[in-house]
Amino acid sequence: RYTYETNVMGTVNLLECIRLYPSASSVLNVTTDKVYENKEWEWGYREIEALNGFDPYSNSKSCSDIATQSYIKSFFSRETSPAISIARAGNVIGGGDFSKDRIIPDSVEACSKNEVIHVRNPYSIRPYQHVLEPLSAYLWIIFRQDSDHSLADCYNVGPNEDDCVTTGKLVSLFCDCLLYTS
């Protein structure tokens, strides 16, 4: 329940503030690539694909995305409205990521304790990207749409398909960098 309250109602509350106190000129809702209905495709999803995240986290992000689109169509379609976009990013890794079940922090911890690194889905291909890459895209979207509202849209933010690796490969590369064997 808390996940929905945070991701859906948090988005609605923010959009309501923007609607009632129109001082923002450029807004970006950052969701996740997990908003898409998972069809087990081998290729990445496009911005036009159906939204329907399966698990509660992914589904709450789908709902946040849909709520944003609803507000855009209902309240922010005038020329004087703020430009509002949605960015959907894949797996972001980098500094400050100490949440539970995170591949890099978990690998660092296992290495520091000389333990085996446990990889839940070693063959899962994910669009891993360093936190500065999507951040750069977010800032670019906000900056550009502020002066050209026609750029307000939904954007997938991630690496090229050729740069996506399996989780197992990511851990292997990490271990190679540390000269660690799990």
PLM regions with names:
Residues 63, 67-71, 107, 170, ...:
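Hydrophobic alpha-helix immediately C-terminal to the catalytic Tyr-X-X-X-Lys motif of short-chain
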Residues 89-96, 118-129, 150-165:
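Glycine-rich Rossmann NAD(P)(H)-binding loop
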Residues 32:
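Residue(s) in the substrate-gating loop at a strand-loop-helix junction
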Residues 180-181:
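Conserved small/polar residues in nucleotide/adenosyl-binding loops
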Residues 86, 100-105, 127-135, 164-168:
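Conserved loop-to-helix N-cap of the C-terminal "lid" that shapes the substrate pocket in Rossmann-like
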Residues 2-16, 20, 25-26, 35-92, ...:
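Catalytic helix-loop patch of NAD(P)-dependent Rossmann-fold dehydrogenases
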Residues 105-117, 128-155:
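Alpha-helical substrate-binding/gating segment
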